[in-house]
UniProtKB/Swiss-Prot annotation:
The keyword Lipoprotein does not apply. Belongs to the universal ribosomal protein uL14 family. The gene is rplN. The keyword Cell inner membrane does not apply. CDD domains: Ribosomal_uL14 (cd00337). This is Large ribosomal subunit protein uL14. It holds the Pfam family Ribosomal_L14. Part of the 50S ribosomal subunit. Forms a cluster with proteins L3 and L19. In the 70S ribosome, L14 and L19 interact and together make contacts with the 16S rRNA in bridges B5 and B8.
Amino acid sequence: MIQMQTQLEVADNSGARKVQCIKVLGGSHRRYAAIGDIIKVSVKEAIPRGKVKKGDVKNAVVVRTKKGVRRPDGSLIRFDSNAAVILNDNLQPIGTRIFGPVTRELRNDKFMKIVSLAPEVL
């Protein structure tokens, strides 16, 4: 469950290390984002010579949450941290590598690239 002001780790090699959610996209008064939802983020911490720099405002997709995701069979997939992958204006990932596992819920036509780059899909 990601909302405004939530700090997230970045699960790609775009150069950002920490981002903060500044808006949950999709609806005028939408409060929470779950895995697979697109949010607007501000880069709070970045490495030198990265593709993004501190203060940049980008779109991102949530790939891991502490809240987790409930599957139709009743199982719950949870993670130790909240993480996102930074996207460009065409909603494609900026980075060329994904770190850590992602869930099967990302496996739709929009985020197939993230699933294929991920080392593990749960």
